[in-house]
Amino acid sequence: MPSSNKVRKVTSENYPTDAGREGELIFRLVYQQTGCKKLFSRLWLSSMEDSAIREGFANLKPSTEYDALYQAALCRERADWMVGINCSRLFSCLYGQPLAVGRVMTPVLAMTVVREAAIAAFVPQKFYTVELELTSGCTASSRRISEKDAAENLLAECRKEMISTIQKVARKEKSENPPLLYDLTTLQRDANRLLGYSAQQTLNYVQSLYEKKLTTYPRTDSCYITDDDEEMLAGLTDELEEFLGIAADTADFAVPRTRRTVNRDKVTDHHAILPTRSMLQADLDALPTGERNVLKLIIARTLMAVSKPYRYLETMLTTECAGEEFTAKGKEILEEGWKAVERKVLADILSRKQEFTTLPAMEESECAILSAELKEGHTSPPKHFTEDICCERGIRNHP
């Protein structure tokens, strides 16, 4: 056959399977089954954009660079087979009914059962606090008191004195650096926390965005880019700001701080998830709601990651009344930084504004008490495992 003659004349092969562990395994298994001995090179793509595909063909990699990736996938396959086939058969025989055992599934199930047992056995404990409303304009709280009689006695003493002594006012400037770029796990956590999407839903959405050339490769465990990508990211953030119409709206969208996103040592198979330049020409309103929301998260995180830190002044007030110490904490924003990006880009996703107390300027002195109240509370049980917690613990994306 002519086609067979053409095959025999081929001296080397290129394989473009999914650029990840399982894609590597699929090609190697097929290659081994064919008995082919020809040399082969790897086409490794992090984006489906035409420019990225052309660059990939221009920079084909020797297959030997991905031998460790293939071996890792092969170990995963063999481990799943050994544990799943053998243990499922063993426990099905022991219990007289079909019982599936999995290398990942069974430990996760055990972890969940232990947590649910702890929740079921939890007995809530009451506690009490005394709250003082001061004329300075803030509310100070006592420590937690387990005995109601002791709390009521403290309340009575405070109401009798109606004067507190401010012992200490500590002010400290603090800052929060921007979050890193998204890897798959952090994207899934945010999508679950903010949008209620399951980890699988988020993966489906971002995979579809990748296939539509709107985002880069989704199955990455890196939150960084390489030095080669830094110039690309700087240009992309400028275009994103212009695309969203926010660049001139606030000083927090200043020169992008891309250097903090660069760490070649922490980029394994793929860099962090980014929007592509093709996205800038796309009709985002035509996307399904889930895909549009996930894309908005990725755009916001890309801009947040290169923005200024969030700076604020934290004030801790310590006051004394009836021999008991009361405390109040407040916060004053100095520079909104990356939180301004989050607020503006995700305005329709963030369910509520961040609330905090601003304490007035105070000095160490006596302060009158306007009112004193007794508050009752209960200790909380451990939290049920959620998609967010499962992603945080790495049990969804690192099988």
What is each model feature region?
Residues M1-P399:
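Toprim catalytic domain recognition across nucleic-acid enzymes
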